[in-house]
C-alpha cells in the first residue's frame, strides 16, 4: 500500500495567475490565495465534488499584481506583498487593510511573518530585504552582503531556538541571516540559474531552494552546508515541505513533483489533464503550492487562474 495523490476539485474565482496560497491550522475550512488580478480571495472550503470551495471575500487595495500572502498564526490577519511596492496587513474578520508598509522602491516579491508574528520580512526587486514591525515601521534594511539581484523569496525559520531568515534571489544565491543582528550567517552557493523560491522545513532544520536550473537543493540550516540535490527536470516555481511527512513538493513547469526525502524518490507526479484542441497551446504552469495544516490536502495555483486540489490517498500502485 502506497500513499498517492488524488485530484479532488478546483477553486474558480481569480482572473489572473494564482501567485500564492496560504492555509492555517486555526481555520481548516479557509484558505487565502493571491493573484495577478490584484486581489486576495478568502475561500470557504465546501469540498463539493463540482466546486471544492467558494470565494467568500475579496481583499482589494493593491494596485498591481499581488505576489505573496501569509496568514498570522492566530488566523486573524493576513499579510501580502505586491508589485505596487507595498505590503498590506489585512484584518480577516472585516476584510479591511489595517496597515500599509511603504519603503521598498520596487515590486515586493515575497513576505513572511516570524513564528511569534511580531516581525515581518519582505524581499523586493530593489534588491533589499526589509524587516518591519506589525505597526508598519521598517526596523532594518539588509543591504550589507545582500543580494546583488532581485530578492525573490524570504522566509523565517519556525525554530525559535535558531532565529534566522532565509532568502534567495536572481543572483543564484541562498542566504541565511541571523535575526538577532541581521548579519549574514551563510551563503549557499551551487545554483546555476536565478532562484524563485526557498522554503524551510517544519522543524527548521533544513531548507530547500529552486528556480531556473530545475534543481531542488537541500541545505542544512544548523550546519550551514549543502545536503543533496533533486533534479526536477523543469523550472521550479514553488517548493513546500509536507507538514507531517518527510516529503518535498515542487511546482515544476506544468507539473508537481513530490519527493520522499528519506529515499530521495518520487512519490507522485501531478499533472492536470488539459483538454486542448490546439496542441501548440502551452499547458498552464503551476505557480504556487500549499499544504493544509494536517498534510492531507495539497492546493496548487496555476497560470490558467485556477486552484487545483489534491488529497493524499492510500493506493495499490
From Swiss-Prot:
Q: Which SMART domains match?
A: WD40 (SM00320)
What does the similarity note say? Belongs to the WD repeat G protein beta family. Ribosomal protein RACK1 subfamily.
Query: From which organism does this entry originate?
Result: Oreochromis niloticus
What is this protein called in UniProt? Small ribosomal subunit protein RACK1
According to the record, where are the WD repeats? Answer: 13-44, 61-91, 103-133, 146-178, 190-220, 231-260, 281-311
| Keywords on record | Cytoplasm, Repeat, Ribonucleoprotein, Ribosomal protein, WD repeat
Which terms does the record give in the GO molecular function aspect? ribosome binding; translation regulator activity
Cysteine pairs bridged by disulfides in the record: none
Q: Where in the cell is it found?
A: Cytoplasm
Q: Mind naming one GO cellular-component term on file for this protein?
A: cytoplasm
Q: According to the lineage, what is the superkingdom?
A: Eukaryota
Q: What does this protein do?
A: Involved in the recruitment, assembly and/or regulation of a variety of signaling molecules. Interacts with a wide variety of proteins and plays a role in many cellular processes. Required for VANGL2 membrane localization, inhibits Wnt signaling and regulates cellular polarization and oriented cell division during gastrulation.
Extract one GO BP annotation from the record: positive regulation of gastrulation
